[in-house]
Regions:
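Short glycine/threonine-rich loop-to-helix capping motif typified by GTGT followed
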Residues: 54-62, 255-259, 292-315, 326, ...
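Conserved catalytic cysteine-centered active-site region
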Residues: 54-107, 114-146, 190-217, 249-251, ...
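Condensing-enzyme catalytic core mediating Claisen C-C bond formation in acyl metabolism
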Residues: 1-23, 133, 137, 157, ...
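Short hydrophobic alpha-helical module
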Residues: 249, 274-281, 291, 301-308
Length: 395
């Protein structure tokens, strides 16, 4: 396969309810990405768009076609990907495969969502459809409840007192808020930098033991990336960032992973694929934008990705090993918790952040020193879809 590089990235700020439509939001991100690479819409050979809830948010189906027309890519092949929170990661991964195959040399990928505009009630109800409609959804399953159960299971499996685990989870939240507060693209930019553990633990209970500050927000936003073959990339940028490995796995309902929980076996398999293709190990990763939809999810993900021993991730956060300057910098963007979670755009937003980190373009206080290898991690549903990507500096 051919080498594939990220040559341009663009992103809106992730926010609460927006007045712009999803087509308009994506156009903003796509225009920025193309401008970075000094490309015009007619240079784009195909579009790959993540969008999970647009049918319910705006009553708009087939959004990929309207996005293509709106950004000046009329008649260009356009595809939409739906994998819950992993939608944009699926889109970027598929775009990578098309360029790696040699079929296209320049493509645009990304995602868009207006989940905040839906409001918490409608967003929660429609989002729950990403659980199994045969068994989980009829039982009233919501994702805060799923991760609350995983929190109890984690505490029991690794013999950690629940209050101690909650304090470790609070440190995850505090770190995410710290980074997000200085990220101009983040939903909580300028907010919560000095939040205390007491405030995190004392916020109202969403699903015991998870409190408000354990949970990420619904967000509106879009992100886009331009991918190009190595030959083309060298003509477009002096700082190509190569996607050197990808992985994806699915498992259906969470019960299929019962022999592994609270580990997410699909994530282990997906990340192992990515590591193998890239020819690296977890020890080589300088930073990772991982799927912290809930604070417990950060602990579970960082262990499944191989960064920390099972049951020990909370201790790693306590020691600063998951922060900038530690063993591996986790979510220097602020992650889903602080940067925000526009469902169908989140994965592309992770690629945006890792790319800028590797290029050394991030604001002081968030920049990972001399970062050479970064990773993305997105989870769709309650573990039903996992996508991982490895990005490396190409100069």
């Amino acid at each position: 396969m051919k080498k594939v590089a990220v040559v341009g990235v663009g992103e809106t700020r992730f926010t609460g309810p927006q007045t712009k439509t999803e087509v308009e939001l994506f156009a903003e991100a796509a225009t920025e990405a193309m401008a970075e690479a000094d490309l015009k819409p007619q240079d784009i050979k195909a579009l790959f768009i993540g969008n999970a809830l647009g049918d319910f948010e705006e009553g708009q189906g087939m959004i990929e076609s309207y996005i293509a027309e709106n950004i000046g890519c009329l008649y260009v092949p356009a595809n939409r990907y739906e994998g819950a929170c992993a939608s944009a990661s699926m889109a970027v991964r598929d775009a990578w495969m098309w360029v790696a195959s040699g079929y296209y040399d320049i493509v645009l990928a990304g995602g868009v969502e207006r989940a905040a505009t839906m409001g918490t009630g409608l967003a929660t109800r429609t989002f729950a459809m990403f659980s199994d409609a045969r068994y989980e959804y009829p039982a009233g399953v919501t994702f805060p409840a799923v991760f609350a159960m995983l929190t109890h299971l984690y505490a029991d499996t690794y013999k950690i007192p629940l209050q101690k685990l909650r304090e470790q989870m609070a440190r995850v939240t505090m770190q995410s808020y710290k980074h997000g507060s200085i990220n101009p693209k983040a939903q909580f930019f300028g907010k919560n930098a000095d939040i205390t553990m007491e405030k995190v633990l004392g916020s109202f209970v969403v699903s015991t033991p998870l409190t408000l500050h354990d949970c990420c927000p619904f967000s509106d936003g879009a992100a886009a990336v331009v991918l190009a073959s190595e030959k083309v990339a060298k003509k477009l940028t002096k700082k190509p960032v190569y996607i050197t490995g990808t992985g994806q796995a699915s498992c259906g309902p969470l019960i299929n992973q019962k022999d592994y929980l609270p580990r997410i076996r699909a994530r282990e398999l997906s990340s192992q694929q990515a590591y193998k293709i890239a020819g690296i190990t977890p020890k080589d990763v300088d930073l990772c934008e991982l799927h912290d939809c809930f604070s417990i999810a950060s602990l579970i993900a960082s262990e499944s990705l191989g960064f920390f021993e099972y049951g020990k991730a909370g201790e790693a956060w306590e020691k600063g090993e998951a922060d900038i300057g530690g063993k591996v910098a986790i979510n220097p963007s602020g992650g889903l918790k602080s940067k925000g979670h526009p469902i169908g755009a989140t994965g592309a937003g992770q690629v945006y952040e890792v790319t800028r980190q590797l290029r050394g373009e991030v604001e002081p206080g968030r920049q990972v020193p001399d970062a050479k290898i970064g990773m993305t991690d997105t989870l769709g549903g309650d573990g039903g879809t996992l996508v991982n990507m490895i990005l490396e500096r190409g100069w």
